[in-house]
């Protein structure tokens, strides 16, 4: 994982993140705007792909693995540290993870079969879906059409972390 700015990296699943300057700004933004849709854009080091998508992550941290959307784009809900506290169950909360370009090298690209253009296309497709969705219902219907297996995985993870009746995003 990386920070888009040049501050030291702190994971959003670490309480220290929300005590940092940027974390406090994020919480202020959420409290002020009370969004219906909230999306965090992250990048990750492709060499951590398996670690981020493995159930070992859940066993070690209690946080479900990120879900493979396709073309090395990963998706999940937002940190459980803020999901239940700062948002209603009706808020659509997503974290989108994209490989950090500056961490890519020919060896990593070959090892993981990474295609930058396909990854960008997948990322843009989901961002456009989020931007064009006027309601949770519309978003859910479109996600089921395009990413059915990922939605079922998200539902399973939401139940593990938030309980049986909690939505998958």
Residue ranges and their predicted role:
Residues 1, 9, 38-40, 93-95:
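Conserved beta-strand scaffold positions in the cores of enzyme catalytic domains, especially
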Residues 1-17:
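Active-site rim/loop-helix segments in enzyme catalytic domains that contact anionic ligands
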Residues 7-11, 48-50, 105:
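Extracytoplasmic/secreted cell-surface and envelope-processing proteins
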Residues 18, 23-37, 52-169:
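C-terminal accessory segments enriched in acidic
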Residues 42-45, 99-101:
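Catalytic metal-binding/acid-base residues of hydrolase active sites
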